[in-house]
Amino acid sequence: AKDVRFGADVRALMLQGVDVLADA
């Protein structure tokens, strides 16, 4: 469960990063 939570957090950060790059 911990690994899944971590994976979800990383995925969210990646998606957020993509949004930031798209806005840049």
UniProtKB/Swiss-Prot annotation:
It comes from the Eukaryota. Shows ATPase activity. Signal peptide: none annotated. GO terms for molecular function: ATP binding. Implicated in mitochondrial protein import and macromolecular assembly. May facilitate the correct folding of imported proteins. May also prevent misfolding and promote the refolding and proper assembly of unfolded polypeptides generated under stress conditions in the mitochondrial matrix. The lineage of its organism: Eukaryota, Metazoa, Ecdysozoa, Arthropoda, Hexapoda. The keyword Zinc-finger does not apply. This is 60 kDa chaperonin, mitochondrial. GO terms for cellular component: mitochondrion. Its main location: mitochondrion. Forms a single seven-member ring complex, in tight association with the p63 protein. Belongs to the chaperonin (HSP60) family. It comes from Heliothis virescens (Tobacco budworm moth). Transmembrane segments: none annotated. Keywords: ATP-binding, Chaperone, Mitochondrion, Nucleotide-binding. Testis.
